[in-house]
Amino acid sequence: MKISRGLTPSTSRPYSVVTIGNFDGHHHGHRALLDRVVATARREAGTALVLTFDPHPVKILAPQVNLMFLTTPEEKLARFEAAGIDEVVFLEFTTAFAALSPAQFAKQVLCDGIGTRELYVGEHFAFGK
């Protein structure tokens, strides 16, 4: 499994099938989402990709919150690899990044940055604010 920090040209990946999140705890819903991403990527001879953020957005948006995690970064990566994920992309979460509109995020990150062809997200996912 490839681990990337930051965006790389989208031409370097075939048919990117992407999910976005922090995946703390890796519960049944996370597994189902990862399974769908992997199955779609395999069907399309593409890349199963997890897009995640470092630091966690809450650490930037609400630094007063004492955020605790269920899984370590190493445990998350091991679970992604066991699920069949091909690549994990870590993006630095900053106040400037948080200020991107949903349209800017879709264009700059999803389309231009990682070449997303299909995107799968969980039930409570929201783009931007």
Task: Indicate residue ranges for each PLM-predicted region.
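Nucleotidyltransferase catalytic core that binds NTPs
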Residues: 1-129
